[in-house]
Amino acid sequence: MAAKIKKNDQVIVLIGKDKGKIGIVRKVIAKSKVIVEGVNIVKKHTKPSPSQNKKGGIVEQESSINISNIAILNPTTKKSDRIGFRVKNGKKVRFFKSNNTICN
């Protein structure tokens, strides 16, 4: 099955502590998890590494979120939407189901 959500898609969070936040997908992990820019920020404790000249401390970074907890944002309606597939000129393209516009 083709990926309905891809890198650089604008998405909205549906469930969780960041519900309602909008961000851009930075990475898709194994078709079940994604990393969204500015969403699900966690604090990671790192040890100092003198060989790599890295200081230790607490670093904030984005953690993965399940793909079922996000939805793609339709730029024309500014609301969450579902994605469908169709063949156009011999190529498989994604489209928004609410208004049948082609997704980039």
From Swiss-Prot:
One of its GO terms (molecular function) is structural constituent of ribosome. PROSITE patterns: RIBOSOMAL_L24. One of its GO terms (cellular component) is ribonucleoprotein complex. It comes from the Bacteria. Part of the 50S ribosomal subunit. One of two assembly initiator proteins, it binds directly to the 5'-end of the 23S rRNA, where it nucleates assembly of the 50S subunit. One of the proteins that surrounds the polypeptide exit tunnel on the outside of the subunit. Belongs to the universal ribosomal protein uL24 family. This is Large ribosomal subunit protein uL24.
